[in-house]
Amino acid sequence: MWLTFALAICLGVVVLYVPGYLVGRAVSLERFASVAAAPAFSVVALVILGVILNAAHVRCDGWMLLLACAALCLLIYGACRVLRGLRGVDGRTHLTRNAVDSEWILVALYVGVAAAVSLVVFVHAMGDPVSFSRNDDTTVHLSVVRGFLDSGTFSTLNVTKYLDLGESGGYYPAAWHVVTAVVASLVGNQVALATNAMILVVCVFVLPVGLLFLLRQLFPDNKLALYAGSLFSVAFCGYPWGFVVFGQLLSNLLSFALIPGALGLLISSLNASGPSKSGFAVAYACNMISVALAQPNGAFTLGIWSVAFAVSHLWSKRSDGYWSGKRTAIILCFIACAAWVLLFVAPPLQGVVTYSWKSTLSIPKAIVAGLLFMFTNREGVQPFLTVLVLLGIAKTLKDRRLRWLSVSYITAFSFYVIDVATDGFVKQLLTGFWYTDYYRTGAMTVLFAIPLAALGFAWLVKLGTGLLGKMRFGRQGSNNSCVVAMVLVVLLAVC
């Protein structure tokens, strides 16, 4: 059974990365960017094909949907290569051998650390590959996947728990379920096993690799922060593990995991030039769609992060024309706020934005709980992460280019406090897109805290190295940094 589970994990990686990688290369992304964007491309292709086949009254097995997806992505890759050849455009990105080697070393580090943590936190507690949580949301997830498999239809426009019994369904953000059904079809339709495998694929591969791609854009000259980032992709209880022990919120798990890579693509698109610039823009748009297909509130989470970065980028941009950077940034803020209000009053979303969870904490307690990353009673206090995030915020105050990271985090933190400690119109307006669910707004806060934690860890290592060098009569070097880093890793593990 464990060998089948390992096979399911490998198949999950293939399903998410192989088809999408071809599309990434087709739109002129360099290899690592194509890997980071691959899950989003694959998700969009699988969901669209599922809808089209169902509309055409074509029933198929999950592995057949995967073959169709691979064929479509291969066709896109071939067509783009031919078009570039006819136009005489070289869409390749040339990197030095050292840069390429460094990228894949970091990928191995991020995936390795996430795998080690996941083995301890998830696999050890799981007990058996076919175990499953007996929560209400989990039974729905398993039933939807089973319905896809038994009915031979994979349309997110026709989702119900009883699809295999002929019941007509409706729209549901079921990207997670489509992907899981495809994986399950390759391992004997074992739904629970495929679900557990996909949880690991998201936590060990999708989230860490996307985070690495984002941090490479944020900290291009801070190697220590890049290496430190490997410690934090799955270090917080609030996300991803909060979504695994509560609900389970598996659609949100995938949606949020796609967000770091998507933001990295936006940053790359604004900094790139040549054919890759449009490629990054296409990849970002596709990532936004995939995030929404997995769970729409993820699109709002990505929107907050994206607008914060875009405003910061425009504000610092020098221009003498009428459309100066600052003027454009202000207009973008107004457009974002107007779009928020329009979506809040949109009839299709009323069932979501009017749903309300009652407040459970006072405002002071909510602030303390949020600072300690104990967003609910199912999660633990993590004081060392608090220190690192606060140090990261302090560091951004010294770097105007990164201040938007702190603004985003404070915004998400405020949403969580309002969500868990108040009731009324303001709560619905600000957090209604997340069902006023403080598990989800808390997870958003965690997501925005991860880069700050990496930045704070790197800064603390530098401070500790300097202090240790002075204590050792001025001798400084890489050994001091290693000692300090090891001490901090131990503190992270126990605190």
State each model region's role.
Residues 330-337, 459-495:
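Signature aromatic-anchored transmembrane alpha helix within multi-pass, membrane-resident enzymes
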Residues 106, 110-257:
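Active-site lumenal/periplasmic loops and adjacent helix-entry segments of GT-C-fold
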Residues 45-49, 119-126, 151-154, 226-245, ...:
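Membrane-interface helix-loop junctions at the exits of transmembrane helices
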Residues 278-296:
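Membrane-interface alpha helices of multi-pass inner-membrane proteins
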Residues 310-311, 383-406:
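Hydrophobic, aromatic-rich transmembrane alpha-helices
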Residues 259-280:
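Membrane-interface transmembrane helices that cradle and orient dolichyl/undecaprenyl
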Residues 1-107:
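Membrane-embedded, hydrophobic transmembrane alpha-helices
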Residues 7, 56-63, 130-134, 188, ...:
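Membrane-helix boundary/interfacial segments in multi-pass membrane proteins
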